[in-house]
Amino acid sequence: MKTLSLILLLLSLSANSSDLSAPQVAIQKYFEYFNAKDIDSLNNASGQPFTLINGGRIIKWNKYGDSVDFGGLESSGWAYSRIHQNELVYEDDMTAMVNINFSRYDSADAVISTSDVIYLLVYRDGAWKLKSGFVNGNLTLGK
């Protein structure tokens, strides 16, 4: 029975991911890179400069990797993040906006925080790149 449940879950996840637009898939990949703490892949998946509007403050970094401190996140208890909602707001040939609701979890799978972020993506060099994030509330990147 457990095997059947696992197979159905995997099929469900596979079916859901195939329904996503290319910008939504780009955001999923970004979360995979973030969870892997892969700064190089995060930089490659984002436009330069990267801006974040967070708690009413506008912050700009040359590269996404300059914005995040995984050591600081881990010291706050962060172990990984998980997307709950991935909604395409807008897409044209050059830009897209994706509305994300996600949670950060600790190593015991307890929710640390839940946030809503709208990401702006740009289409450059044949790929969707994360350019800006608009946070509804306050979201730490470990700094």
Residue map of PLM features:
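Beta-strand elements of well-folded, non-transmembrane domains
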Residues: N35, R104-D106, Y123
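A short gly/proline-enriched turn/hairpin at secondary-structure junctions
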Residues: S46-W61, S76
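Surface-exposed, charged secondary-structure patches
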Residues: S67-A110
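A mature extracytoplasmic/lumenal domain signature
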Residues: S46, G56-R57, I100-R104, Y119, ...
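Sec-dependent N-terminal signal peptides
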Residues: T3-S14
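Short, low-complexity N-terminal intrinsically disordered segments enriched in polar/charged residues
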Residues: S12-I39, N44
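Short beta-strand edge/turn micro-motifs at domain boundaries
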Residues: T114-K143
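Hydrophobic pocket/interface hotspot
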Residues: Y30, L42, F50, V98, ...
